[in-house]
Curated annotation (Swiss-Prot):
The lineage of its organism: Bacteria, Pseudomonadati, Spirochaetota, Spirochaetia, Leptospirales. SMART domains: PCRF. HAMAP family: Rel_fac_1. It comes from Leptospira biflexa serovar Patoc (strain Patoc 1 / ATCC 23582 / Paris). Belongs to the prokaryotic/mitochondrial release factor family. InterPro entries: PCRF, Pep_chain_release_fac_I, Pep_chain_release_fac_I_sf, Prokaryotic/Mito_RF, RF-1. Gene3D superfamilies: 3.30.160.20, 3.30.70.1660, 6.10.140.1950. Keywords: Cytoplasm, Methylation, Protein biosynthesis. This is Peptide chain release factor 1. Methylated by PrmC. Methylation increases the termination efficiency of RF1. Peptide chain release factor 1 directs the termination of translation in response to the peptide chain termination codons UAG and UAA.
Length: 353
């Protein structure tokens, strides 16, 4: 481990040096992101190497020390140092796991109503509100890209972006089917209905990551029915883009400007094309699938929200909270932390196997 930690130190210092010399904005951005990623492990590695040297120095002194009090003090110092090294080694094991290739990326979130009719659409709106509140607590900016509303305050679908380097790491375990059990407001008999909503987390893809030919696109413009007042209903500001080779269709209508809506739709298109390629690759990566918390499959039922019992259960890790009202208000830290810890444990076990 010592050699590996020294290499990390060297890499970090090299990045610091390159940052001091860099002038191009893209280079500065990439170097800053890499430094930010390495800083925690560099700090921990520095502490580990320092304590290792202190222990070695104390052992050398112990061999030639005849004074009983000094001998006892050095022995105690070595024991404390070795205990601390054990703790640091466990932390470093986790920190040195291969990073998720999408870590540090902004994301697009798609929430779609599934089975359950109007009740599913209402829960789609509830999930968006929950994520919006959680994002706000974490300082993430939510930007709506497209939405299709139902007549009673729900959504058939809503797509939004979270533009922050913490976004993917916080939301990556939300992909899948979310099931809700509750008595609908429209239900006169008081019967519990079960509905479902699907969530897709799409890491944002940069233009250089996904090549899209203009000739492969069919672009349609139409009058928006979204936010923005009367203006959006009197001009063809909404944009729908079809990627002919894959059949992927994306849309954006939340901006007054057709150009801005086109840019937003292209962001979604790039993310979906990249996601489709990743899903194809994932089918042949069985070992990687087993190392993750759940498969991230859209059809996988990951969580149940039981309103009559005030209970939320994540089926992938057996996590249950009996404080559903707080969760629906965006208090997701305990749940997401549990998912992150379980994922780390599985990846660590896989690395040692």
């Amino acid at each position: 481990m010592i050699d590996r930690l020294k290499k990390i130190q060297e890499k970090y210092l090299r990045i610091e040096d390159e940052l001091a010399k860099a002038t191009a904005s893209d280079t500065l951005k990439n170097l800053s992101k890499e430094r930010s990623r390495l800083t925690p492990v560099y700090t921990k590695a520095d502490e580990y190497l320092k304590i290792t040297k202190d222990c070695q120095d104390a052992k050398s002194l112990l061999e030639s020390e005849n004074d009983p009090d000094m001998h006892s003090m050095l022995k105690s110092e070595i024991e404390e140092g070795e205990k601390k090294l054990e703790e640091l080694a466990k932390e470093l094991e986790i920190m040195l796991l291969p990073p998720d290739p999408n870590s540090g990326k902004s994301i697009l979130v798609e929430i779609r109503a599934g089975t359950g009719g109007e009740e599913s659409g209402l829960f789609c709106a509830d999930l968006f509100r929950m994520y919006n509140k959680y994002a706000d607590k974490k300082g993430l900016r939510v930007e709506i890209i497209d939405m299709s509303q139902t007549g009673i305050g729900g959504y058939k679908e809503i797509v939004f972006s979270l533009d922050d380097d913490k976004a993917y790491d916080l939301f990556k375990f939300e992909s899948g089917t979310h099931r809700v059990q509750r008595i609908p407001e429209t239900e006169s008999g008081g019967r519990i209905h079960t509905s479902a909503v699907t969530v897709a987390i799409l890491p944002e893809a940069e233009e250089k990551e996904v090549e899209i030919k203009e000739s492969d696109l069919r672009i349609d413009v139409y009058r928006s029915s979204g936010a923005g007042g009367q203006h959006v209903n009197t001009t063809d500001s909404a944009v729908r883009i079809t990627h002919i080779p894959t059949g992927i269709v994306v849309a954006s209508q939340e901006e007054r400007s057709q150009i801005k809506n086109r840019d937003k739709a292209m962001r979604v298109l790039r993310a979906r094309i990249a996601d489709q390629a990743a899903e194809t690759a994932k089918l042949s990566a069985d070992a990687l699938k087993k190392a993750q918390v759940g498969s991230g499959d859209r059809s996988e039922r990951i969580r149940t929200y039981n309103f009559p019992q005030g209970r939320c259960t994540d089926h992938r890790i057996g996590f249950t909270s009996h404080n559903l009202p707080a969760i629906m208000e965006g208090d997701l830290d305990e749940l997401i932390d549990a998912l992150i810890q379980e994922d780390r444990s599985k990846r660590l076990a896989e690395a040692k196997a």
